[in-house]
Structures are given as C-alpha cells and as structure tokens.
Design a protein with these regions (language model features):
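Helix N-cap/beta->alpha junction signal
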Residues: 47, 120-121
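Conserved active-site segments centered on acidic
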Residues: 2-112, 182-188
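Hydrophobic beta-strand core positions in alpha/beta domains
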Residues: 38, 117-118
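Phosphate-binding/catalytic loops
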Residues: 3-16, 115, 121-188
Length: 188
C-alpha cells in the first residue's frame, strides 16, 4: 500500500495549478449538477464499484440530469486500467456494468466535486492532506457513515480477500450508496 509522500502531494498540487492555468476542464460536462467523487487506493475495486452502483441508483430514479458521479484513486499506478476483473465479474452478476478507467485524484477534483467519498480511514486521511482548503476538506466523508444495514467502520479492500470479499464489498456499497443517494436528494 502506497502512503502519500511529500513528492506525491506536490505532484498532485502542481497538476492542479497547471489545470487552473489551462482553464478548459470539462471532463464530465456537469455544470449545475451535484457531483460525487468516490475514492479508494487504486481506483480498480471499491471506488469504481461505488460509482457503478451509485450511477445505477441515479438512473433508476431518473436523476441523471441532477446528479453525476466519478471515481479516482489515491495511488496513480493503475491509471488507465479497467476495474479489477474480479470486481467487474461480481458487479456484473448483480447488474452493474463497470466501464470506468482508473485515474488518480487530481488537485482540481476538490473544487470540482460537491462531495468526496472515501472508502476507508487511510483514504480519508490522505484526502484530508490533499484538500487545498478547509472548505474543500468539509466535502470529504467516509462511505461507512452511510451504512445502515452493516456495522462496520470502513469499506475493506477486497483485492486480497477472494470472491467472498468482493461480494461483501458490493453488499456494503449497495447499502451505503442507497443511503448516500437519499441524503443528496434531500438537499436538491
């Protein structure tokens, strides 16, 4: 597991500054929509699954014109990769297609998104260190805080857990995403 280093933080901040200087970001075409970013370590298991589940809920409720989601990882080593094959298979079995390409959290994600959802305590701490302002740090929440059917304080990384780990994570994310969606809709 990669810990954030000062060089990693500086790299992310520098990319943010370069982005602001370019002034042409429109990746998601999401002006005037509520924007949610799901974050895990590598953006190949938990966060793309959360994004897929959340987007499914948004579509079921015909709210695509009001709410959008994306996902990213603290670690950039998987950038450009598809979600883990085991997660894609487990998600597809439940009706969720995961077509996301992994990417690393970018400095400009903080002002761009309304809510940034961390999968575990380390992701949360890393995001808090990356947040460029106190205002941006208030957007960071733990996914586990939206769980109502499960008594667990974080979403575990299923990477080394076997097939039952992927199933557990999907159970947790379905619970959390459903409640997250409901809490967002109340604010719109």
């Amino acid at each position: 597991m990669q810990r954030l280093t000062q060089n990693t933080i500086e790299d992310i901040v520098n990319r943010s500054v370069n982005y602001k200087n370019m002034n042409n970001h429109n990746d998601l075409n999401i002006n005037n929509k509520y924007k949610v970013l799901f974050v895990c370590l590598g953006n190949i298991c938990r966060s793309p699954a959360a994004q897929g589940i959340f987007e499914h809920i948004v579509r079921e409720n015909a709210m695509q014109d009001r709410i959008v989601a994306d996902s990213a990882g603290i670690y950039g080593g998987h950038s450009g990769s598809h979600p883990d094959r085991r997660m894609r298979t487990a998600a597809l079995y439940r009706g969720y297609g995961l077509s996301h390409s992994a990417r690393q959290v970018r400095g400009y994600d903080f002002p761009e998104f309304d809510l940034i959802v961390a999968m575990d305590d380390q992701n949360y701490e890393d995001l808090m260190h990356l947040a460029p302002s106190v205002e941006d740090s208030h957007k960071i929440v733990r996914m586990a805080s939206y769980l109502t059917e499960h008594k667990i304080s974080y979403i575990p990384d299923p990477y080394y857990m076997g097939s039952e780990g992927f199933s557990l994570v999907l159970d947790l994310l379905e619970d959390g995403c459903r409640n997250l969606y409901e809490s967002i809709v109340k604010t719109l």
